[in-house]
């Protein structure tokens, strides 16, 4: 009985030491990193939307020339926050900056409509 166990243990040790078994864990599947994840896609989409809102910043800033100084201050502050958020690439900051820019743009439109 002891001889059988020692033969079995020796055979098992030889099989486990063979190159076929030792190379098994080297053939692991690697995840592809070339495709963007859903978070990266959402961040990129939000960054593009924020950039397009920033492109409209100068036009809206010029439109505030005849309005109250509140609009001038608010649009400058919102623009600076949006630029900072784009540099940081933080989703939360970008979404807040986008909301603020859209809000002030709508307020400027309403103020211009009521004035003229």
Curated annotation (Swiss-Prot):
Signals that turn on the gene: Up-regulated by agr and sae loci. Down-regulated by sigma B factor.
UniProt keyword Secreted present: yes
Superkingdom of this protein's organism: Bacteria
Residue ranges, annotated region (Essential for activity): 62-79
Any one annotated GO CC term: extracellular region
Keyword entries, A-Z: Secreted, Signal, Virulence
Gene3D superfamilies on file: 1.20.1270.10
Signal peptide: 1-31
Pfam families: CompInhib_SCIN
Subcellular location as annotated: Secreted
Function description: Involved in countering the first line of host defense mechanisms. Efficiently inhibits opsonization, phagocytosis and killing of S.aureus by human neutrophils. Acts by binding and stabilizing human C3 convertases (C4b2a and C3bBb), leading to their inactivation. The convertases are no longer able to cleave complement C3, therefore preventing further C3b deposition on the bacterial surface and phagocytosis of the bacterium. Also prevents C5a-induced neutrophil responses.
Family: Belongs to the SCIN family.
The protein's name: Staphylococcal complement inhibitor
Species assigned in the record: Staphylococcus aureus (strain NCTC 8325 / PS 47)
Gene: scn
């Amino acid at each position: 009985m002891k001889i059988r166990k020692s033969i079995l243990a020796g055979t098992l040790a030889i099989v486990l030491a063979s190159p076929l078994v030792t190379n098994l864990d080297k053939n692991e599947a690697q995840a592809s990193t070339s495709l963007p994840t859903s978070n990266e896609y959402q961040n990129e989409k939000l960054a593009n939307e924020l950039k397009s809102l920033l492109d409209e910043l100068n036009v809206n800033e010029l439109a505030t020339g005849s309005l109250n100084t509140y609009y001038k201050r608010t649009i400058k502050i919102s623009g600076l926050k949006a630029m900072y958020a784009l540099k940081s690439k933080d989703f939360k900051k970008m979404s807040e900056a986008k909301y603020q820019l859209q809000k002030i743009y709508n307020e400027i439109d309403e103020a211009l409509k009521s004035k003229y």
